[in-house]
Amino acid sequence: MVFFDLGDTLWHFPAMPPVEVVRGETMKRVSALVRSWGYEVDGERAYLARDIRFAIEEETSRAFHGDCIDPGYPDICRRVAARHGLDLTPEQGMALWEAWNLGGAFLGRRLYPDVLDTLRWLRGRGYRLGAITNRGYSGPRFHEEMRDLGLAELFEVTVISCDVGYMKPHPRIFQYALEAMDVEAAESVMVGDSLRADVEGAKTVGMLAVWRRPSAADPVEATEDQPEQAGPVQPDYVIGTIGELRSLPLFIASGPAG
């Protein structure tokens, strides 16, 4: 069984719009939603999208470097909205969170060139595939994008932190994935770009770990992990691209372990 991280492992954002365009679009969508609920959007309330971003960045960092419990992003949106005088229901909090997420299509998400061929090669050798990802949004638009990218048909399971309540490297998210696929950790491999989230997390539960080493062209999600590269947990294998999996003895010497 081979599990993959998603961001900066299988896909990246080479065509991301300028930051001012992204933030402007977020503000537009959030403001339109708030107006649809009958609220005025003026004064400080016009900066609701910005304040949600600040809170998300703070809470995500706290969780990732702390207890790895998912922060509950719709609730974060409700709390920030309350500071702007908006009394939102849980359903409205979820709608606000969905509006704040622009989606991979808008942000220019693309698979790395060798991803689909490599995943199909692994499937052809009898390996079962899945994904384990730290992600605050798992709504219908995300799963539609997974289908559009060609990943949904290749993965038997996609385990998302906001759905299970735990972020990598917490053992529970890995255990959830193993239980969902009815496989043992010793039979499984984790491939990802984060030494802490993917390598440390996988090895803690007894999985093999392949580190997809971030390149200079992929700085977005790698920056956070740079201090961890000298840590005590080391990957079993290191690759520069997903295509290099096809040359690892792990995958060419034999078929799946179980």
Feature map (PLM): residue ranges:
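Short, Lys/Arg-enriched alpha-helical recognition elements, typified by the DNA-recognition helix
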Residues: 50-56, 76-78, 96-103
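Short, acidic loop-to-helix structural element flanking the phosphoryl-transfer center
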Residues: 67-75, 90-92, 99-130
